[in-house]
């Protein structure tokens, strides 16, 4: 079992899932992960499936050099975005894993929230491409490690409304108010 960058706040009410050396672009996966951070697990499923179907977009905020402007990104108060299908599929698989881990642990699957998600760079994978005049150039890929912690959301109980206390008014002040009311 690998080491996670943080420990969950409440280990009893949360579970973990991770993928190492995944052959999917680091930059795309990082942006996709940021889009589903702090999201309810069912909402994240829907969102990622919509991304695969190109109904919703992933806003590219950090790694946005050369990324085209899209109208769908306006929903996120941003201009640039893409539909990274492979990253969405990998994250869907990881969400399924986290959900089944929660089910085995006995947590309520419908109230799970993505508490922590982090994407780290993995070592580059090296291939080669053949160029003119007998030269060989590198053909690198940038894989990544993904870790996520999902937690059962506590039910928010509305606070009972406190009764407004009536201010105590002294006899002297009450007499003054009565006197002013007569005038």
From Swiss-Prot:
GO terms for biological process: cytoplasmic translation. Coiled coil: none annotated. Signal peptide: none annotated. One of its GO terms (molecular function) is structural constituent of ribosome. The keyword Ubl conjugation does not apply. The keyword Ribosomal protein applies. GO terms for cellular component: cytosolic large ribosomal subunit. Keywords: Ribonucleoprotein, Ribosomal protein. Belongs to the universal ribosomal protein uL22 family. NCBIfam families: PRK04223.1, uL22_arch_euk. This is Large ribosomal subunit protein uL22. The lineage of its organism: Eukaryota, Metazoa, Cnidaria, Hydrozoa, Hydroidolina.
């Amino acid at each position: 079992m690998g080491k996670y960058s943080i420990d969950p706040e409440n280990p009893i009410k949360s579970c973990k899932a991770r993928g190492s050396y995944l052959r999917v672009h680091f930059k795309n996966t990082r942006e996709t992960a940021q889009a589903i951070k702090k999201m309810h697990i069912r909402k994240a499923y829907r969102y990622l499936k919509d991304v695969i179907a190109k109904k919703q977009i992933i806003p590219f905020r950090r790694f946005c050099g050369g990324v085209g402007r899209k109208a769908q990104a306006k929903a996120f108060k941003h201009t640039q975005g893409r539909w990274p299908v492979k990253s969405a599929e990998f994250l869907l698989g990881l969400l399924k894993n986290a959900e089944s881990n929660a089910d085995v642990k006995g947590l309520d699957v419908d109230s799970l929230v993505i508490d922590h998600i982090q994407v780290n760079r993995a070592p580059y994978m090296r291939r080669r491409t053949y160029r003119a005049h007998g030269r060989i150039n590198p053909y690198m890929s940038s894989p990544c490690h993904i870790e996520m912690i999902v937690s059962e959301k506590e039910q928010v109980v509305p606070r009972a409304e406190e009764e407004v206390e009536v201010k105590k008014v002294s006899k002297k002040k009450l007499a003054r108010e009565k006197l002013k009311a007569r005038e």
